[in-house]
Amino acid sequence: MYAQGYFAYDSKKSGGLTVSHLRFGHQPIKSTYYISKADFVACHNPSYVDKYEMVEDLKEGGSFLLNCPWSDEELEERLPGKMKKIIAEKNINFYTIDGIDIGKEIGLGGRINTVLQAAFFKIAGIIPEEDAKKYMKDAATKSYSKKGEKVVAMNHAAIDKGIESFHKVNVPEAWETAEDKTVDVPATGDRADVVEYVNTILKPVNAYQGNKLPVSAFSNHVDGTAPQGSAAYEKRGIAVDVP
């Protein structure tokens, strides 16, 4: 089995976006481009469903795993109409898992990577489940043994929970005709240069669409400078809990 990983991440000091492009195969992998036809996509933060295109690049019949605390009924209200429509039209296998709740239950708090990784191997079926479980537990033991048996046991529990705790959503037929009610509200303000920069460049970049910007979008910034004050327009709302 061969594997290839490419990780695209932003420059945020913490809480930034990371997109992992992973390929697996029985022959050497020499692809040098982002994945645009995926068999599996996972979203680890529920707030991302309103911020990024999550399922557009999934293949027909692919799998989508969403980490969220929502019930099937709540998904109806929480998911954008465009996402629901694509899930239904492409016959996507849609799964949810509450990784945050699992992390709190076993003592790992917001550290959910192990939980989601275990769910990935179970759903994707790249290697037999028992092999995946063994490899992950062996790796956890090697990585955390110096921190004590309790930490190792928590990570082993996270692996078991990730494999058994995801839920397959019964996608309603009505999602095929779901309407996209997303409204793009342009930035406003007293400084025209900041507003122009935010609407033309910052918002597409923050939506992970920067590679689609035309050269003309940068006509007012040919020297690479950006106006000060744009941080006031960037309230990401990615926190799991708000005090």
Indicate residue ranges for each PLM-predicted region:
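Anionic-ligand anchoring segments at beta-strand to alpha-helix junctions in alpha/beta enzyme folds, i.e.
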Residues: 1-41
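Glycine-rich phosphate-binding loop
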Residues: 28-60
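Redox-cofactor binding/interface segments in oxidoreductases and associated redox assembly factors
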Residues: 43, 65-66, 117
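ADP-ribose/adenylate-binding Rossmann-like module
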Residues: 55-94
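Short alpha-helices
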Residues: 78-143
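Ferredoxin-type iron-sulfur electron-transfer modules and their immediate structural context
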Residues: 132, 148-243
